[in-house]
């Protein structure tokens, strides 16, 4: 029973983290604090790995040492700074590959990163997705603003390229708040105003503990909640020990972990326990997936609407109302400005925006009209294909309506809508063809409903709603209601 209750509690903690961090992302106040664990999957060492050679030389057992800052100080006392700096260079100069956690974080709209890591993987992950990071390594960097920056990366303990200036020994930790006041002030401000997710961080650094304690004194019970990951102590970790010794070590470490988690709550840091480190990637992937599913592509084109309604105005009002209700429900709409569809999408979206006191249209609508002539030696069809793949990759769901065009005086199904459906499926984006609107969307709906488990094995409860939106005889407002129900369930992950 205790194990079952623990599993329920862990699942609840994960869901709360996902919900709250998504909220922070949508409000543009999410931040990351990265420790050595974030880079471990890329092959870089943690603190113990960094100081193992130093411990061996001091005739100490690195596995028995818990105060690694003092260990670094002992090595410095005996050998000077150059040897320590060389250890940093030897362990962090290798060209490492980004891991999945880096890639996921870089795709999220996070503009603030704090890290104690010396490597440059965070910066690389951001540049790889076309973002422009502004990196702060020393105090003088605060006075310099990188033009058109997308994110700030605060490297409070230094950088591999300045190994001799990294924060590593007890002397440097003790003087951190004197020598790095701008980092301390900046971190305090962000911890008060943003929601942090701590990844790969052990909370052993005295400089962060000092900052957290100051915030606790200043804010009391009004502090903002933050979240961190810990791997839950597992009995299997001690199977290499004799049974009695393993049992005792497991019991001791479990108690210590519980106490540490409870202590972090004093600073409004909510620990989320995972069974294995891969679970962190799964949680981050869920956050990315749900965030993207708040952005909806409306794909479609039309020169006529007869398979759905007899007249143009009724069809335009359907598209208008659908777009308006999507924006009202908190979704951001992306449109390629398809013929006969795009204008109504814009009007419906603006109808809601202008009915409120919100005026930042870019928060609700992404317009990506297709290029009309070829450039850079590409054929126009190839350029369109590349363009489609680019803007579809930025959404999490795609709604397909109508889908026809005129060729040689005849109305035929639109191949472009078919292509966008195939691209979306290939990219793992959830597809919602509204079969009731006819034409290519009807064909795509038939494929989806016939192979429902292929597309929606994780959402069996939505099948009746998908069946409903394929029938043109239903009330148009009810069809829209069902579409909103589907995309809302997809965004929530259930």
UniProtKB/Swiss-Prot annotation:
The active site is at 157 (proton acceptor). Pfam families: SIR2_2, STALD. Probably activated by a signal molecule generated by endogenous ThsB1 and/or ThsB2. Can also be activated by the signal generated by ThsB of B.cereus. The activating molecule might be 3' cyclic ADP-D-ribose (3'cADPR). Residues 11-295 form the Deacetylase sirtuin-type domain. NAD(+) binds at residues 30, 119, 157. It is an enzyme of class 3 (hydrolase). InterPro entries: DHS-like_NAD/FAD-binding_dom, Ssirtuin_cat_dom, ThsA_STALD. Its main location: cytoplasm. Coiled coil: none annotated. GO terms for molecular function: hydrolase activity. It comes from the Bacteria. Keywords: Antiviral defense, Cytoplasm, Hydrolase, NAD. 3'cADPR binds at residues 300-301, 339, 370, 388, 405, 416, 420. It is found in: Cytoplasm. It catalyses: NAD(+) + H2O = ADP-D-ribose + nicotinamide + H(+). Its EC number is 3.2.2.5. GO terms for cellular component: cytoplasm. Residues 296-494 are annotated as: SLOG (STALD) domain, binds 3'cADPR. GO terms for biological process: defense response to virus. Homotetramer. Belongs to the soluble Thoeris ThsA family. Has an N-terminal deacetylase sirtuin-like domain (SIR2, residues 1-295) and a C-terminal SLOG (STALD)-like domain (residues 296-494). The SIR2 domain has NAD(+) hydrolase activity. The SLOG domain binds cyclic ADP-D-ribose (might be 3'cADPR); binding alters the protein conformation, allowing NAD(+) to access the active site. This is NAD(+) hydrolase ThsA. The lineage of its organism: Bacteria, Bacillati, Bacillota, Bacilli, Bacillales.
